[in-house]
Amino acid sequence: MVDQEKETTHFGFRTVAKEQKEGMVAEVFHSVAAKYDLMNDLMSFGVHRIWKRFTVDCSGVRRGQRVLDLAGGTGDLTAKFSRLVGEQGEVILADINESMLRMGREKLRDKGIVGNVSYVQANAEALPFPDNYFDCITISFGLRNVTEKEKALRSMFRVLKPGGRLLVLEFSKPLLEPLSKAYDAYSFHILPKIGELVAQDAESYRYLAESIRMHPDQETLKGMMADAGFENVTYSNLTGGIVALHRGFKF
């Protein structure tokens, strides 16, 4: 008898068919797109700006280079990279979610950030770019929402130039137990209430909190990047390990 069971994955704490997750995540981000920047500031007390600034500082991006801001959303990193690469460089803001991509495009154009930025709707698991194309790739608070993380990392490796680097900024595992307990209390009790009050959507922010807990910890993600082909993989814990920045190179 042929096994008819479907492959499964997690959507927050729920187990769902792999083929369903992409659509379910899409609905979350369609729902939160309009209030995404405001909620980021409220949820992190503005600290997400420091985490992103650190990521840019670690990128090594220079004038004339080509950068992929994957899962770039509303374009915080793209705006910074646009200034660094200058007129001769290029930044591609890619996101699988049409609503997030539209918000990012409108936000950056309103700020006058045009000319060296383009926008592509793309799935991280099958990036529509040539081999050895980018000098630097960043994915900020996006990898945990990808169904096949290993496949996405291999796709990023393929389109990165030799000598290029990948930076993964993502929520991770707090280093100290007291911080972990306080973080859990905030994430599961306060965060959904903020989502309900500000975005009229407690459920999406409950999923976001759950997705953080299901994401690989620092050492596991380091190993996954190495398995995908990246070398000299390291990470920096930020805010006590609530967030980590992983770096890997293609040689």
From Swiss-Prot:
Q: Which Gene Ontology molecular-function terms are recorded?
A: 2-methoxy-6-polyprenyl-1,4-benzoquinol methyltransferase activity; demethylmenaquinone methyltransferase activity
E.C. designation(s):
2.1.1.163, 2.1.1.201
Q: What does this protein do?
A: Methyltransferase required for the conversion of demethylmenaquinol (DMKH2) to menaquinol (MKH2) and the conversion of 2-polyprenyl-6-methoxy-1,4-benzoquinol (DDMQH2) to 2-polyprenyl-3-methyl-6-methoxy-1,4-benzoquinol (DMQH2).
Identify this protein by name: Ubiquinone/menaquinone biosynthesis C-methyltransferase UbiE
Family note: Belongs to the class I-like SAM-binding methyltransferase superfamily. MenG/UbiE family.
Q: Per UniProt, where does S-adenosyl-L-methionine bind?
A: T74, D95, N123, A124, S140
Q: Which HAMAP family match?
A: MenG_UbiE_methyltr (MF_01813)
Cross-referenced SUPFAM superfamilies: S-adenosyl-L-methionine-dependent methyltransferases (SSF53335)
> Which principal EC class is assigned to this enzyme?
transferase
